[in-house]
């Protein structure tokens, strides 16, 4: 028997492993099984080189539990090891030193195991003792047994072993008894080893017999040694891809389409990415794409390997150029990983462009299911955006689809304003904004539908990329103001009449929570609506963008600001003003006369300010007295007009019709409108 100390530069590696890898200790099984698979693959390589003459068609890895002995054993029939190889690969562990080791990896637990060839030692995370029973493939080799109880000391001696290969026998620690449970081991094997390239056996197949499941004599192979991504795309059918999709994403609808990745230069990468029906569900989950290294599961947290927007997809990526054990920060900084990320982005964009050209109709039918993915990509990845500008679609209120360039050509002849700006009109709710859409259509304008979750930031992005272009929601102003074709029409209301109208209508707008209303005027055609409610494009968009950008919370807290726009050329509006003037003439005349006289006094006093330093001291009191008087007179005038308006059903009806058209008339105000409508019949 040989005794010795493990050649490490720290006095005891095992407390280090247990301390810093405790949170990830389940990966020991992946490491031990991966080593076993490597041993079988190396034997196959030797056979191909003519250095091994035996059979290689029965290579396998077995995992066995012995709850009575408290052991978990991983066995392979690979190359095995000689005493010298045990000494080299197990006993002599070299790395840079304890202090550097701890400082570098204490925050990156998963980066330790495997990074310095320590995969075997991960067994000590869950074991109080580990044995190696091994017999090398080399002719005349002796079977060896190596034993270590977690201290730097080990024993090595000859043993009896009939078959070539290695058994790793782990005596599970009392605190880690979960790794003696069949279901726990089965779950870990399914997670980490389900696609390993060599059969992995755990337990027996079962059959239903005498009212219960019983073991058969057939070994249960838990993995698929030739997963779909390792096969040539030309030999696969659609049903193969769909079947594999449901194997890795059970319970999901069939995918829309997929991309089979296959590249071997300047890096090696295979995989399959599936496009599910995303629709308006911006759920960026971190576990939909699984990352493998030579068919060994690494992680399903692929930030850094693929751009964020790609995490809306599902599937697998396999690359030996991504280290098996890495931290997230390592992934994000690795040069190969960055190249892989760029390649995947380019490949996905190319596939989408190909689909859009190959069958335009089919691509349009899928658009609403993938729209949010493409918009998210265009908003977050500039390179993807450049490619996507060629195939991204927009749709109008009639349900027609257009590529961005095609739509620009469609509208630039008719929707360019007098200043040369191309105006894109859009709606977010076809039913609620029907009257505004119709007003635009009546002018011969086309209106886009922008009702998706990311459409508002998408609109802002398109504005930035297209000079002399702007997007405006169709209800943000009257249509003639949205696309100005000529100078303003002449208003048929005087300034005094507009002032009267402003008070008449503003005084009767019902109070609506978190909303403010302003009265404005537009000289429209007599056949246009008499009263229209609009919402400023700028303020509304700022509030909407506040949902996406934390720095814009200020806008999100502001009340909704609406304009009650009166058509100064509409006969009903003019009739209301004429009736008010006629009815209030006797009451308003003395107030107006006194206000006019007071304003004259104010102007006379202000004219005494010759040098811009203010009125003379002896006139300041007179100025304030008259300004206060003017304020009182204006308030009295507004009170008279408001009192008149309160009894005028036409004013209220015009306001309520406009509110109703915007979905703003509710509760008591809606009930009053209905009663008034009946009484006016």
Predicted regions and their residues:
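GHKL/Bergerat-fold ATPase module in large chromosome/replication-associated machines
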Residues: 112, 130-153, 173-177, 183-681
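GHKL (Bergerat-fold) ATPase N-terminal catalytic module, capturing the glycine-rich phosphate-binding loop
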Residues: 1-180, 187, 342, 589-599, ...
């Amino acid at each position: 028997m040989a005794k010795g100390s493990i050649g490490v530069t720290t006095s005891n590696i095992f407390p280090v492993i247990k301390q810093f890898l405790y949170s990830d200790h389940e990966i020991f099984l992946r490491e031990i099984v991966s080593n076993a698979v490597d041993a079988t693959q190396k034997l196959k390589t030797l056979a191909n080189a003519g250095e091994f003459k035996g059979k290689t068609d029965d290579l396998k890895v077995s995992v066995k539990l012995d709850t009575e002995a408290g052991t978990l054993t991983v066995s392979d029939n690979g190359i095995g090891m000689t005493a010298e190889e045990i000494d080299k690969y197990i006993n002599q562990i070299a790395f840079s030193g304890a202090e550097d080791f701890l400082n570098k990896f204490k925050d990156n637990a998963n980066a330790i195991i495997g990074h310095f060839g320590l995969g075997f030692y991960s067994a000590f995370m869950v074991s109080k003792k580990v044995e190696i029973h091994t017999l090398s493939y080399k002719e005349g080799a002796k079977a060896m047994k190596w034993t270590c109880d977690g201290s730097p000391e080990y024993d090595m001696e000859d043993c009896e072993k009939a078959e070539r290969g290695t058994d790793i026998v782990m005596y599970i620690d009392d605190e880690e008894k979960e790794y003696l449970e069949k279901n726990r081991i089965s779950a870990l094997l399914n997670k980490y080893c389900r696609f390993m390239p060599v059969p992995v056996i755990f337990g027996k197949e079962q059959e239903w017999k005498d009212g219960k499941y019983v073991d058969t004599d057939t070994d249960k192979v838990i993995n698929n040694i030739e997963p779909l991504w390792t096969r040539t795309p030309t030999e696969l059918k659609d049903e193969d891809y769909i079947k594999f999709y449901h194997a890795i994403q059970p319970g999901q609808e069939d995918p829309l389409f997929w991309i089979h990745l296959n590249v071997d230069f300047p890096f090696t990468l295979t995989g399959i990415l599936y496009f599910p029906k995303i629709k308006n569900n911006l759920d960026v989950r971190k576990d939909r794409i699984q990352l493998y290294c030579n068919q060994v599961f690494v992680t399903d947290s692929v930030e850094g390997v693929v751009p964020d927007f790609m995490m809306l997809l599902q599937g697998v990526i396999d690359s030996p150029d991504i280290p098996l054990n890495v931290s997230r920060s390592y992934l994000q900084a690795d040069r190969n990983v960055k190249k892989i990320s760029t390649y995947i982005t380019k490949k996905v964009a190319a596939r989408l462009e190909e689909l859009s050209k190959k069958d335009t109709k089919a691509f349009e039918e899928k658009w609403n299911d993938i729209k949010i993915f493409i918009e998210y990509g265009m908003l977050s990845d500039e390179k993807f955006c450049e490619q996507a500008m060629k195939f991204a679609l927009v749709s109008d209120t009639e349900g027609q689809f257009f590529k961005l360039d095609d739509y620009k050509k469609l509208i630039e002849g008719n929707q360019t304003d007098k200043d040369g700006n191309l105006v894109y009109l859009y709606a977010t709710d076809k039913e609620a904004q029907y009257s505004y859409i119709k007003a635009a259509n009546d002018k011969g304008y086309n209106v886009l539908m922008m009702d998706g979750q990311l459409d508002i930031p998408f609109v802002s992005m398109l504005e930035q990329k297209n000079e002399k272009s702007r997007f405006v929601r169709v209800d943000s102003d009257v249509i003639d103001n949205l696309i100005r074709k000529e100078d303003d029409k002449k208003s048929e209301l005087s300034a005094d009449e507009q002032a009267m109208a402003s008070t008449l209508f503003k005084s009767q707008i019902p109070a609506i929570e978190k909303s403010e209303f302003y009265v404005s005027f537009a000289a429209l055609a007599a056949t246009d609506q008499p009263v229209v409610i609009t919402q400023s494009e700028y303020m509304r968009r700022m509030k909407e963008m506040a949902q996406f950008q934390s720095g814009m919370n200020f806008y999100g807290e502001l009340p909704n600001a609406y304009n009650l726009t009166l058509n100064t050329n509409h006969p009903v509006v003019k009739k209301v003003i004429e009736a008010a003037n006629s009815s209030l003439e006797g009451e308003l005349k003395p107030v107006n006369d006194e206000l006019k006289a007071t304003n004259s006094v104010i102007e006379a006093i202000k004219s005494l300010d010759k040098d811009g330093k203010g009125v003379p001291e002896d006139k300041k009191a007179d100025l304030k007295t008259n300004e206060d008087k003017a304020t009182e007179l204006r308030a009295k005038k507004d009170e008279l007009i408001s009192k008149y308006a309160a009894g005028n059903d036409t004013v209220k009806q015009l306001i309520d019709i406009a509110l109703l058209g915007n979905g703003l008339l509710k509760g008591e105000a809606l009930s009053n409108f209905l009663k008034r409508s009946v009484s006016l019949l």
